[in-house]
Amino acid sequence: MLLLNLLVIALLGCAASKEARPLAGTEQIPPAETPVGIATTQGVQTAPTADTPISSTKPAASSTTRNAGNDSSAKDPPITVPSVKGRTKKDSLALVKAVRFGAENPNWPVKTATQLPGAILPGHRIIAFYGNPLSKRMGILGELPPDQMLARFDKEIAAWTRADPSTPVQPALHLIAVVAQGSPGRDGKYRMRMTDSLIEMVSSWAAKRNALLFLDVQVGKSTVQEEVPRLIPFLKRPNVHLAIDPEFSMKPRMDRRQGVVVTAKPGARIGTMSSDDVNYAIRLLSDLVKQNNLPPKVLVVHRFTHDMLTGASKIRLDPRVQVVIDMDGWGQPWLKYDSYRAYVEAEPVQFTGFKLFYHNDTKKGDPLLTPGEVLLLNPKPLYIQYQ
């Protein structure tokens, strides 16, 4: 088994000159023929602490937004922190800050064109199980046998229906269809494409629950432009949607110490995508909708650091494509709330998502956030993913 030095825990409570730097750790990576997947490196967060300004995450065109980091000496008015049963005061404070930050940002809700027929959002909330059947480590989708997985899925769907009866739940299975790898493979792209037969298998599971199917792309050293078109035969189906994961998009960068351009392999550092990458995916999906008379597609973009998505204000919305920025970092409740505030609320795009990790979120003894606790956020996430 290969070992990669991974970033796993954010340094908390320190002043951020650029970003708080996580501590180093190690995790085991499967051999090249086995998908590495998000479970091996996922959840590295550099969210500010509750008392740290978020200067690097100021939303575009929102100079009137309070506490976006323009003035690090500015003080919040006193807050009465509500008691959230079973949570610490730190958790509650982070929640209050996230709720207030979203409420005071004049760019929420995002103004968009008239909704097209068949659009899923905002009239529904998508609840998704994430992973890959080839690995138990990459998420709940592959952790349990299909029947057990779907039974657990049913329970989560019921819980969200009870928590918010006013917003119908739309079930979804979220398959990592292109999986980042720790080794280069034959073409040196550090990614593995899943077979059509595997995608069809998960599609058959989704059909049992009248669920959507999301195809998630971790490009490694490839590109969105190279990987997504291969999925077009599936994306032509009305119930199939797309997700792209900047964490595993390993673009060339200048190593200032060595004075050379380098491209890290997946897991060695957190990757990045630009608005150009997102806009390409939007255009491709929009063309498919138009050419095939399909209902609007949903595009999920994962994010848990500022630099994972650059130029968010330049993302060009299209009524044929509904864009979700999904906060997919793991950790204690306060860190997840802070990350949602800093990396999703601070740069409004269109709709928001929130990821829950059955294992990583509970490592330190914290119970998994409940639907009711997630729904306290403002804006309320309309895409919920379980890993």
Q: Where are the regions that the model predicts?
A:
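Bacterial N-terminal signal peptides
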Residues: 2-11
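Loop/turn elements at helix/coil->beta-strand transitions in domains of secreted/extracellular proteins
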Residues: 168-169, 207-212, 237-241, 293-298, ...
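Alpha/beta catalytic barrel-like cores
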Residues: 14-195, 313, 317-323, 334-387
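Aromatic-lined carbohydrate-recognition surfaces of secreted/lumenal glycan-active proteins
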Residues: 219-224, 290-308
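Substrate-binding cleft of extracellular glycoside hydrolase catalytic domains
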Residues: 159-163, 168-247
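Active-site-proximal loop/turn and secondary-structure-junction residues that shape catalytic pockets
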Residues: 133-135, 177-179, 219-221, 246-250, ...
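A cross-family glycoside hydrolase active-site/sugar-binding cleft signature
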Residues: 130, 172-176, 214-218, 243-245, ...
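Substrate-binding surface in catalytic domains of secreted glycosidases
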Residues: 246-294
